[in-house]
Amino acid sequence: SRNPLAPPEHIGENGSIKNSMVALGCEIFGTVENSVLGSNVVVEEGAIVKDAVVLANSVIKAGAVVSYSVIDENVTVGKNAKIGVEKDEKAEIVVLGRGITVADGVSVTEGQKHENDILA
């Protein structure tokens, strides 16, 4: 597959990446663990992405938590929103479709699938 032209990934002073794959153009100011990030994904300060796949051009805003989820392209997860649950053998994955906007502070619980919505 081809990667779009993008600058190298940037890890901010408080950003951390552990056991993850991060594509070109990503900006990491929060925490990314056991995850895969597509190109040009932004994880703002205080945000956590764990056990998740986040596709290109998505933004995880400050204080948001994304766990055990698949996030499609061009998704915005609002400040302090909570997507998914901690991964365990009984947990069900959350899927957010392309272009969804999750409002600040919204929780999306396990096993949900949303396509082309604004979650407020």
Predicted features, each with a name:
Residues 1-120:
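Left-handed beta-helix
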